[in-house]
Amino acid sequence: MSAGKKHARDGEDQGARLVKKAKTADTQTDSDPAALKTDKKKKDKKDKKERKEKKEKKSKKEDAEEDSEELQNGDSAAVDSEPKPEKEKKEKNNKKDKKDKKDKKDKLKSSGAPTTNGIAQDGEANAATTTPNGSAQRNGAAYSYQQTKTLDAIPEDEIKEFLAKQEIAIADPLGANLRPIIHFSHLPTSTLTSKKPFASFTAPTPIQAASWPFALSGRDVIGIAETGSGKTMAFAVPCIESLASSPKPNHAKGDRTAYARAVVVSPTRELAMQTHAAMSSLASLVGLSVVCLYGGAPKDDQRALLRKNSGADIIVATPGRLKDFLSEGCVSLSDVMFAVLDEADRMLDKGFEEDIKLILGSCRPREKRQTLMFTATWPTSVRGLAEGFMIDPVKATIGNRTRAGEEGEGNGSTELQANIRIEQKVEVVDPRGKEQRLLELLKEAQKGSAKNDRILVFCLYKKEAVRVEQNLERRGIRVCSIHGDLRQDQRTRSLESFKAGTTSVLVATDVAARGLDIPEVKLVINVTFPLTIEDYVHRIGRTGRAGKKGKAITLFTEHDKSHSGS
């Protein structure tokens, strides 16, 4: 081979090798495992960083939502004290506002009230804007109390004049400005009011006018008014309206327990029976049942009555009998959404305090029930205990003994005072001539056209009442009696005979002094001075009722000094 050819061949080989080397280098760059591994690491690192950033962002978002929920629910747990970025704070506030709006909308929806743009609308032509109610959904009832247009249209000066004339003082810790219901037409339209249950009455009594707006709004109410002022209807109307607008809870078939949705507790059998009669007439108009439970009557008969009605919507009871049925398990108050203590000062007196705690403790918690207390007096000694059963109660006080709002206190406190329409007289007599003087007073009071006037004679002890009754019978006085030693049927007959006018004189111990509706009592005579000033006020409060005048005479002897404060 010539040198030229060899040189050319070497050049071709070198060129081929360079091309091959270049191709090999390209191939190594694309397929070399080490290079691929390096690229993957870089990519993984980048992906990991992005995931971490997303996770941190999500965590911050969740923290912000949790903080917003804590603010919304009032949670007392500690939250991050470090300042948040402005954007995050704004985001939290927006979420809170949205949640508030949703909650309000849900509440309106659950109440059954039609809404327009989230604002409750009343379909009645006579309805005005919704008024404050404080706790409308607390016990599960669909409260939608609204002042009527006719009530709204009354000038404020006339409202103030009405309150002053009727001596009404209202103290509301929540400051809801609800006007008194001056006329029955001012009551919201409902199934009950459409039946015209008040057709025979001219206007609500002051305690009804003052308490109804708040009670119909779902608020707890303390009503303080003299006896004979219409307190029974003051709590009966909102109780029945509340139950009529709420669904009945379901219970297992075959459950023999009697469940109630409302309970009214009264201190005496007579008052319980009287309240039962008044509430039954209203409840029947809307298909609700009322059962009365009291001592002195067979338990089996009352159990049978409960079974017959599959329980009762409303139970009116004395504390002792209700406590017995609760302990036996035949009555349950776990569904009670409306509780009433009638004659509350006596109910919370020393002997009833534990019973009341047991009864109210068997009901729904106070946050989930409505509690009303009505009474003629409100002694300082029981105010604190009574308010422990309630939430932000409104105090409606009737009479010139009120001091609600005085000097900016707004505490609704009252001074104990007898009915100012009652003429009071005290006669100091010799103990041995007391019953003879009683006979003289009765004959003087029942002269001529007043011979059938009703006179109520109070004794301190049962034995004294029996002796006085027998003595008057021997002297030809038409008399009957009511005291603790009599059977329930005997007490009922005596009370009905006195109300009907068959007998014109009723001899009683203090058991008859509280809350009984005995119309047209012209005179009250205290043969023996009562043990407390509260009992004295309630005794003489049997006369001078419903705006009428009355008279009370107390026979006072040296033996009465020890318990009269003399």
Swiss-Prot record:
Keywords noted in UniProt: ATP-binding, Helicase, Hydrolase, Nucleotide-binding, Nucleus, Ribosome biogenesis, RNA-binding, rRNA processing
Q: Where in the cell is it found?
A: Nucleus, Nucleolus
Q: Which SMART domains match?
A: DEXDc (SM00487), HELICc (SM00490)
Class of the enzyme per the UniProt entry, highest EC level: hydrolase
Q: Which GO terms describe its biological process?
A: endonucleolytic cleavage in ITS1 upstream of 5.8S rRNA from tricistronic rRNA transcript (SSU-rRNA, 5.8S rRNA, LSU-rRNA)
Residues annotated as domain Helicase C-terminal: 433-566
Task: Place the motif Q motif on the sequence.
Answer: 182-209
Q: What is its EC number?
A: 3.6.4.13
Q: Which reaction does it catalyse?
A: ATP + H2O = ADP + phosphate + H(+)
| Compositionally biased residues, Polar residues | 127-139
Q: Where is this motif: DEAD box?
A: 342-345
Q: Record's PROSITE patterns?
A: DEAD_ATP_HELICASE, HELICASE_ATP_BIND_1, HELICASE_CTER
Q: Which family does it belong to?
A: Belongs to the DEAD box helicase family. DDX5/DBP2 subfamily.
Q: What does this protein do?
A: ATP-dependent RNA helicase required for 60S ribosomal subunit synthesis. Involved in efficient pre-rRNA processing, predominantly at site A3, which is necessary for the normal formation of 25S and 5.8S rRNAs.
- Protein name per Swiss-Prot or TrEMBL: ATP-dependent RNA helicase DBP3
Native species: Chaetomium globosum (strain ATCC 6205 / CBS 148.51 / DSM 1962 / NBRC 6347 / NRRL 1970) (Soil fungus)
